[in-house]
């Protein structure tokens, strides 16, 4: 590009207009107002910057506190859920333990009752046996006493006869005195013998009565000892049950105390949340969620109360089930008899149905075999006849048409027989399925299908 000439530069200067004159005072005033506005804008900017930093810091601190409280609340809810689960597990354990203790108590009580009844029966049998032996001994002694008395009377009678004979023969005073003396001595001996036997009989009767009384006292003492042992055992069971109930009450009181502490903690958390800044919508939503979870916690507490009520109802149900046990056993025996009767009837009916189905299947199979044999025989005969006749083509076609129609009828008959066979098989399968269903309904073990094949 060539340099411009002086004329061009002069023309340029002439074309530019001169600026208007400026008042220095006005310009100075404008400049001061601009500086004031700039300073004010800087102060406002600094103020808003500081306020923004404060709001950000407050937002960060508040968010951290909300997160901390949220974590605390989650921890509290987790601990409450863990306590609830442990409480449910303990309740199940205690229920199982109570059932086990009730079963053991019932079993041991039945065993003690059976043992006491057995011991009592054995003692009664031994007592009756002993009394029978004593009675037999008394009867034997009475018989011996009567036999001895009879022998003694016989001896006395014989001696009396001999003495009478001697008296009649001798008729002397000495013999009479001797007879008197002998009579007196015999009577004395007889009296002594009677007294001795009577004393011995009384002593033996007294000894037998003493042994009987001692045996009765021993049985009474043994029965009292067994009764005292049973009483001590049941008292110990009752004491153990009371201790378990006391421990359960203490655990419930501890859980109530924990619930009160959790409620206090929830109240403090709620109060601290209410003191937070309200404009934060997300924080308000989180607080609403926390309140909803607190309501859920209260519902869990009410569920705990319902569980306690259920525990009491379960205890009542245990007592009621004890009363229903005997009735259920009787019903079970009746149902068992009916089940055996129904089982016998159903098995007999099923065997009859299986026999009928098997007979029909055999008949259909025999008919099918006979039809196939007949068709093959007719085919052979037809081929032989056609070869022997040497007929014309039209005649052969007519004969072939008639044979085809006859074969179609036979094929239709075969299809019908196959259909009847399939129908019988389906009926057989349906019968087996109905048998299994009714066996399951009546709680009867169904017979395997291999028994019907």
From Swiss-Prot:
InterPro entries assigned = GAS8, GAS8_dom
Intrachain S-S bonds: none
Q: List the residue ranges of the region (Disordered).
A: 1-22
Q: Chief subcellular site?
A: cytoplasm
Annotated GO biological processes are: cilium-dependent cell motility
Location in the cell reads:
Cytoplasm; Cytoplasm, Cytoskeleton; Cell projection, Cilium, Flagellum
Answer whether the UniProt record assigns the keyword Cytoplasm to this protein. yes
Q: Which residues form a coiled coil?
A: 60-156, 185-377
Which regions are flagged for Basic and acidic residues bias? 1-10
Q: Looking at the UniProt record for this protein, which Gene Ontology cellular component terms does it annotate, in alphabetical order?
A: cilium; cytoskeleton; Golgi apparatus; microtubule; motile cilium
Q: Which GO terms describe its molecular function?
A: microtubule binding; small GTPase binding
The source's superkingdom equals Eukaryota
Database matches in Pfam families? GAS (PF13851)
Supply the alphabetized keyword list.
Cell projection, Cilium, Coiled coil, Cytoplasm, Cytoskeleton, Flagellum, Microtubule
Q: Which family does it belong to?
A: Belongs to the DRC4 family.
Q: What else is known?
A: Procyclic parasite mutants lacking trypanin exhibit a motility defect indicative of abnormal dynein regulation, but have an actively beating flagellum and are able to spin and tumble in place. However, bloodstream form mutants lacking trypanin exhibit a severe growth defect and are not viable. They revealed a failure of cytokinesis.
Free-text function comment from the UniProt entry:
Cytoskeletal linker that plays a central role in the flagellum cell motility. Required for directional cell motility. Plays a role as part of a dynein regulatory system that regulates flagellar beat in response to signals from the central pair apparatus and radial spokes in procyclic cells. Also plays an essential role in the bloodstream form of the trypanosomes as its silencing is lethal for the circulating form.
The protein here is known as: Trypanin
Question: Which species is this record about?
Answer: Trypanosoma brucei rhodesiense
């Amino acid at each position: 590009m060539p340099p411009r000439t002086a004329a061009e530069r002069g023309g340029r200067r002439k074309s530019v207009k001169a600026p208007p004159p400026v008042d220095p005072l006005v310009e100075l005033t404008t400049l001061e107002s601009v500086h004031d506005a700039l300073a004010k804008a800087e102060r406002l900017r600094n103020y808003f910057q500081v306020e923004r930093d404060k709001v950000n810091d407050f937002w960060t601190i508040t968010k951290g506190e909300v997160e901390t409280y949220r974590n605390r609340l989650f921890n509290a809810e987790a601990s409450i859920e863990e306590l609830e689960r442990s409480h449910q597990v303990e309740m199940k354990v205690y229920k199982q333990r109570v059932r086990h203790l009730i079963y053991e108590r019932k079993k041991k009580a039945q065993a003690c009752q059976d043992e006491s009844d057995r011991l009592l029966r054995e003692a009664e049998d031994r007592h009756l046996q002993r009394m029978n032996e004593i009675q037999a001994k008394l009867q034997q002694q009475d018989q011996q006493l009567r036999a001895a008395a009879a022998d003694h009377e016989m001896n006395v009678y014989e001696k009396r006869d001999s003495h009478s004979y001697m008296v009649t023969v001798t008729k002397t005073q000495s013999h009479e005195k001797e007879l008197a003396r002998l009579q007196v001595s015999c009577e004395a001996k007889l009296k002594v013998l009677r007294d001795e036997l009577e004393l011995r009989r009384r002593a033996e009767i007294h000894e037998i009565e003493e042994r009987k009384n001692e045996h009765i006292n021993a049985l009474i003492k043994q029965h009292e000892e067994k009764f005292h042992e049973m009483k001590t055992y049941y008292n110990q069971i009752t004491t153990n049950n009371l201790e378990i109930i006391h421990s359960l009450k203490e655990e419930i009181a501890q859980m109530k105390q924990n619930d009160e502490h959790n409620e206090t903690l929830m109240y403090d958390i709620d109060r601290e949340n209410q003191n937070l800044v309200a404009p934060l919508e997300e924080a308000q939503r989180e607080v609403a969620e926390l309140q909803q979870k607190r309501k859920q916690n209260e519902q869990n507490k009410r569920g705990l109360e319902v569980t306690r009520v259920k525990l009491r109802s379960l205890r009542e149900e245990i007592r009621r089930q004890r009363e229903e046990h005997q009735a259920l056993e009787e019903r079970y025996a009746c149902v068992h008899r009916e089940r055996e009767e129904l089982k016998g009837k159903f098995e007999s009916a099923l065997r009859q149905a299986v026999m009928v189905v098997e007979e029909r299947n055999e008949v259909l199979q025999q008919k099918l075999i006979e039809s196939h044999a007949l068709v093959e025989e007719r085919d052979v005969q037809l081929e032989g006849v056609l070869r022997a006749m040497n007929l014309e083509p039209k005649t052969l076609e007519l004969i072939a048409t008639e044979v085809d129609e006859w074969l179609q009828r036979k094929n239709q008959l075969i299809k019908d027989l196959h259909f009847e066979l399939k129908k019988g098989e389906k009926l057989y399968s349906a019968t087996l399925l109905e048998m299994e269903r009714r066996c399951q309904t009546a709680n009867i073990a169904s017979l395997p299908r291999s028994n019907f094949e």
